[in-house]
């Protein structure tokens, strides 16, 4: 289960960011973008995250995963398509082998939501624009 190792790396990245923040705010949600071609199982990643964040600065935070589909581009016929394993990922129009992946390999932190209510008194949230 490589999701366990990925979760460890994710937690370390989040810890490095969190320690650099004024007042070390409470993290409510971590939003990830995970491509279908990464072979990461979202349910396993969510389980590993919940287990590994117990007793840490991330305890109680939620992992939100947005999957991106595998999209390829065929240079000979100039079309984007969704590769299928049954076709050996070849272009359904002309049969050319998959050359360029345009989407589906992503594995990144999209953004982090902070729970301002739980923040320490040293943390000041950004000013909100006045509504007329």
From Swiss-Prot:
Instruction: Kindly give the InterPro entries that the UniProt entry links to this protein.
Output: HypA/HybF
- The positions annotated for binding Ni(2+) are 2
A GO molecular-function annotation:
nickel cation binding
Q: Does the keyword Metal-binding apply?
A: yes
- GO terms for biological process, alphabetical: protein maturation; protein modification process
Q: Which sites bind Zn(2+)?
A: 74, 77, 91, 94
One Pfam family of this protein, by short name?
HypA
Coiled-coil portions: none
Please provide the record's keywords in A-Z order. Answer: Metal-binding, Nickel, Zinc
Keyword Transit peptide applies: no
Per the similarity annotation, which family is this?
Belongs to the HypA/HybF family.
**What function does the entry list?**
Involved in the maturation of [NiFe] hydrogenases. Required for nickel insertion into the metal center of the hydrogenase.
Q: What protein am I looking at?
A: Hydrogenase maturation factor HypA
